[in-house]
Amino acid sequence: MADFLPSRSVLSVCFPGCVLTNGEAEQQRKSKEIDKCLSREKTYVKRLVKILLLGAGESGKSTFLKQMRIIHGQDFDQRAREEFRPTIYSNVIKGMRVLVDAREKLHIPWGDNKNQVHGDKLMAFDTRAPMAAQGMVETRVFLQYLPAIRALWDDSGIQNAYDRRREFQLGESVKYFLDNLDKLGVPDYIPSQQDILLARRPTKGIHEYDFEIKNVPFKMVDVGGQRSERKRWFECFDSVTSILFLVSSSEFDQVLMEDRLTNRLTESLNIFETIVNNRVFSNVSIILFLNKTDLLEEKVQVVSIKDYFLEFEGDPHCLRDVQKFLVECFRGKRRDQQQRPLYHHFTTAINTENIRLVFRDVKDTILHDNLKQLMLQ
């Protein structure tokens, strides 16, 4: 029967458009495969939930991103933990240098004058050395400074300077690490999950983290919050589903590190006003995270917000009154009060369980709003 089948050459004469050479067939197969990939990519992009983390420097964005990694299945393995060790050592040395400098400028006497030698040693630390300039300190170097750091932290003069920390710039995790010097001083010290969450590494550039929840792809983008980094924000605005705007709610009595003049809460309010009234985000859900609730709760007991925001009318030592005032401040920055609702949450970014519960609610809000937008397209 094969003798009666027309040859390939006959077919090509009779039906020139129906016969493909091996090369043409392969090209067509590749073309179809590319079309399938593009179709899948288009579907993925349409389903992708892109969340932008915005806020002033040290508001907790990077800590929140670390929590997403912990909560959604990519915990820090031993190698990743070890990579944070030089950063933590740098945090400790930098923090102690700030305290030694503050003690002198605030004219606080030493508890023990012999500690002047230790203070001088810390102030002579070479911050321009290659690793130190990148915010890292080797174990060998840290252990050389450890006895001096321990003696200084035990000095009443340094403790008094710490008690007046709102008068100068000091990292919020410094006390945690100084209280754990014995653990940090072990030569084979491996940072714990909590150590990593509290380690401070200023965000330079753009950091992304991808994860899935029930087959829905999420992309979380963290951009540096310092003034010098904010010009990069516009690079991330494309195809944004939601913005999580983080505020350090406890910093109502502190000023910016960049200019030493601007109130930190005022700076956050100004940034938020720019974001919430930007037409680019008219269809984007904006969720306000009033972060560092644990520190705010401590602060309202001893510092009156009314001394810094005269319009405050509640009880300055009542956490709920202060939180209500903060929410009203941010809501008041929206020029169009009829626009999409402004969701808010009170958070403590270093508390994994708190962030797990809050993000569960946030995820539902984002997915609900995103579904409505897709239905309108």
Curated annotation (Swiss-Prot):
Residues 195-203 are annotated as: G2 motif. Palmitoylation is critical for proper membrane localization and signaling. Phosphorylation on Thr-203 by PKA destabilizes the heterotrimer of alpha, beta and gamma, and inhibits Rho activation. Residues 50-63 are annotated as: G1 motif. The keyword Metal-binding applies. Residues 47-377 form the G-alpha domain. Its main location: membrane. Residues 347-352 are annotated as: G5 motif. One of its GO terms (cellular component) is melanosome. It is found in: Membrane; Melanosome; Cytoplasm; Nucleus. GO terms for molecular function: D5 dopamine receptor binding; G protein activity; G-protein beta/gamma-subunit complex binding; GTP binding; GTPase activity; metal ion binding. Residues 287-294 are annotated as: G4 motif. Keywords: Cytoplasm, GTP-binding, Lipoprotein, Magnesium, Membrane, Metal-binding, Nucleotide-binding, Nucleus, Palmitate, Phosphoprotein, Transducer. The modification Phosphothreonine is found at T203. This is Guanine nucleotide-binding protein subunit alpha-13. It comes from Rattus norvegicus. The gene is Gna13.
